[in-house]
Curated annotation (Swiss-Prot):
GO cellular component: plasma membrane
Cofactor(s) named in the record: [4Fe-4S] cluster
Protein keywords: 4Fe-4S, Cell inner membrane, Cell membrane, Iron, Iron-sulfur, Membrane, Metal-binding, NAD, Quinone, Repeat, Translocase, Ubiquinone
Protein name: NADH-quinone oxidoreductase subunit I
GO BP term, example: aerobic respiration
Domain 4Fe-4S ferredoxin-type: 57-87, 97-126
The encoding gene: nuoI
InterPro entries given in the database record: 4Fe4S_Fe-S-bd, 4Fe4S_Fe_S_CS, NADH_quinone_OxRdtase_chainI
UniProt organism field: Legionella pneumophila subsp. pneumophila (strain Philadelphia 1 / ATCC 33152 / DSM 7513)
Amino acid sequence: MKKVYHYIIHYVRTYLLLELLAGLWLTVKYFFRKKITVQFPEEQTPLSPRFRGLLALRRYPNGEERCIACKLCEAVCPALAITIESEQRDDGSRRTTRYDIDMFKCINCGLCEESCPVDSIVVTPIHHYHISERGQNIMTKEKLLAVGDLMESQLAADRAADEKYR
């Protein structure tokens, strides 16, 4: 009897195409609902203050760059995307002469930001950037500082909003 029942169920599923009808029902159900597609260039979805986008270097309020060339970000980077060269200043402090980030290698993990003792390198909410020529994938120190100067007010606001979670 059990074998006959199994055959009956098999033939009902096969000839009535229950899987196909279930798929069609799902399609019909979603066909008449409101669309949730975002038209990307014209519409923007809200970003979290913790969003990890393009990297930037920050400055102190007096205009001096924050990076002290400790090279912790270079050491902690799992993708080996950061290259730092430094030299001693006359006053005995170290400063960077070269700070490059290869954006093809960068995986936007945020470990460089977490390891920085002076909050020099930060991630910004910028997520639309493109590369149209060879060599533009290397973010030099000047480019990183320019992005940091451009985004400083928003970075401060995002850090203030996120402070209780740090």
